[in-house]
Amino acid sequence: MQPTSPAAPHRRLYTEEQRARRDATRWTLVQGILAPLQFLVFAISLGLVLWYLATGEGYAAATASILIKTFLLYTIMVTGAIWEKVVFGQYLFAPAFFWEDVFSFGVIALHTAYLWALFTGQPHGLQMGIALAAYATYVINAGQFLWKLRMARLDMEAAQ
């Protein structure tokens, strides 16, 4: 039987100083409000987009909802970058959130591609297809952030 080696030390998501800055900044509350709001708008918008694709009705409502979702995405990205600066000392790509930030740029690119399709008069089906692709990447990215939120909670429990 082979002796077992001790597990690699767990890398904490936040240092004590970063956790203190995270807990003290108003940008944490802003993110905590914007994230569920964006998800609510996403869920409504997804329903409207799927309704339009299924029935051919409701293009204006679907479009308006995608624009609202895109505005919220841009807002949460800007405020999230400010939050990272306050907590980690850099606007983007802090090691703790590097891959979430990388994937976020894909989400932004697809939402921006939707805006291009809308404002250049591309066919409605193409617009909605791009929106669905943007929404699929958003769901993955939201999952990344939810995972990090869980890791932060587990870190906090381990620290107590």
Swiss-Prot record:
Give yes or no: UniProt keyword Lyase. yes
Which Gene Ontology terms describe the biological processes this protein takes part in?
light-independent bacteriochlorophyll biosynthetic process; photosynthesis, dark reaction
Q: Name one GO molecular function term.
A: hydro-lyase activity
Give the pathway listed in the UniProt entry for this protein.
Porphyrin-containing compound metabolism; bacteriochlorophyll biosynthesis (light-independent)
Which InterPro entries does the annotation name? BCHF
Highest taxon, organism lineage: Bacteria
Pfam families per UniProt: BCHF (PF07284)
Would I find Lyase among this entry's keywords? yes
The main enzyme category here is lyase
Reported EC number(s) for this entry are 4.2.1.-
Q: Which UniProt keywords apply?
A: Bacteriochlorophyll biosynthesis, Chlorophyll biosynthesis, Lyase, Photosynthesis
This one is known as 2-vinyl bacteriochlorophyllide hydratase
Per the UniProt record, the source organism is Cereibacter sphaeroides (strain ATCC 17023 / DSM 158 / JCM 6121 / CCUG 31486 / LMG 2827 / NBRC 12203 / NCIMB 8253 / ATH 2.4.1.)
List the top taxonomic levels of the source.
Bacteria, Pseudomonadati, Pseudomonadota, Alphaproteobacteria, Rhodobacterales
**Coding gene?**
bchF
